[in-house]
C-alpha cells in the first residue's frame, strides 16, 4: 500500500530514484517490475507494480472494444503502458512520450495512492492541490453515494 507524496528530481536522461520506503516493497513484490502509463483524465502518469497492472489488464480485456469509451480507455492505458525494471540504484527511466504527456520538468512528485503512484510535474501538483482544496472548501463537487457515509 503506497501513501504520501515525495518531491524527486529527474536527471538529464529522464530517470528518477524511487524512495527507499517504496523500493523495498517493489523489489520484493514484483522484483522491481513496474508499469507506467498515462492518466486518463489528468496531466500525470500512473505507475503500478506489475501484479496490480496485470489485474487492470485482465479487467480491460473483459470489456468490449466495440464501445467507443472502452476502446479509448484501452487505447490510452494499454497503448501507452511501458514496462520498467528498477535499476541497481532503484531508478526508473521514463520514456520521452510519457514525460511529454505529463509535461514533466526536472522536479516531479511521486504520489502514493494505495495500489499505484501518480507522477506529476511538481509545480502542477501544487497547483492541483490548491484547486482540490478550494473545491472541497466550497463544497463544489458532485455527490457520490460511496462518500455519503464516509467520515474521517
Swiss-Prot record:
It comes from the Bacteria. GO terms for cellular component: cytoplasm; nucleoid. InterPro entries: MraZ, MraZ_C, MraZ_dom, MraZ_N, MraZ_sf, SpoVT-AbrB_dom, SpoVT-AbrB_sf. Its main location: cytoplasm. It is found in: Cytoplasm, Nucleoid. Residues 5-52, 81-124 form the SpoVT-AbrB domain. GO terms for molecular function: DNA-binding transcription factor activity; transcription cis-regulatory region binding. Pfam families: MraZ. Keywords: Cytoplasm, DNA-binding, Repeat, Transcription, Transcription regulation. GO terms for biological process: negative regulation of DNA-templated transcription initiation. Belongs to the MraZ family. HAMAP family: MraZ (MF_01008). Forms oligomers. NCBIfam families: division/cell wall cluster transcriptional repressor MraZ. This is Transcriptional regulator MraZ. It comes from Pseudoalteromonas translucida (strain TAC 125). The gene is mraZ.
